[in-house]
Regions:
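Sec-dependent N-terminal signal peptides
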Residues: 4-12
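C-terminal motif of bacterial Sec signal peptides marking the signal peptidase cleavage site
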Residues: 14-16
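Glycine-rich beta-strand-turn "strand-cap" elements at beta-sheet edges
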Residues: 18-30, 67-74, 103-133
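Short, well-ordered beta-strand segments in beta-rich or mixed alpha/beta enzyme
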Residues: 28-36, 65-94, 132
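Short amphipathic alpha-helical segments
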Residues: 41-63
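An amphipathic, aromatic/His-enriched active-site/gating alpha helix that lines ligand/cofactor pockets
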Residues: 55-65, 83-118
């Protein structure tokens, strides 16, 4: 009887682990923005990046994450993790007043910008990491 219970428990756990996450979204857009800030504009740029990231996540349902980070050994290098629910959410984000203000207000501060498309390796962890997912 004990072996049967262990087997039954293992079967239930295996089924639970293999159950697809109903919230899993194959339409996610994930990328890392790599930004080099011109000398003399770092503090101003950091404030603008913080502001647009916070406003976007707070006010846009399709924005899961905008997380600016500064490279420790290269302070003028900024990386921003961006996650959008889908293409429509991304396009909507590009038209918001807070994004347009950020974009226009920082054009002269940015030396270079590269958007690197990424593919999540553990999408099942998204609900554990991001409250909005």
């Amino acid at each position: 009887m004990r072996k049967f219970l262990i087997f039954a428990f293992a079967a239930v756990m295996l089924a639970a682990c293999n159950k697809p996450n109903e919230k899993m979204n194959n339409d996610l857009i994930t990328r890392i923005a790599e930004i080099e800030v011109n000398d003399g504009y770092l503090e101003e740029y950091l404030a603008a990046a913080h502001n647009v990231g916070t406003k976007s996540v707070e006010s846009e349902p399709g924005v899961i994450c905008i997380f600016p980070m500064q490279v420790k050994d290269a302070p003028n290098t900024i990386r921003i993790l961006e996650i959008y629910r889908n293409e429509e959410a991304y396009q909507t984000h590009l038209q918001t007043p807070h994004f347009l203000e950020y974009k226009q207000g920082t054009l002269h501060m940015v030396k270079s910008l590269q958007l690197v498309a990424t593919e999540p390796l553990a999408p099942e962890a998204m609900p554990l990491i991001f409250k909005k997912y």
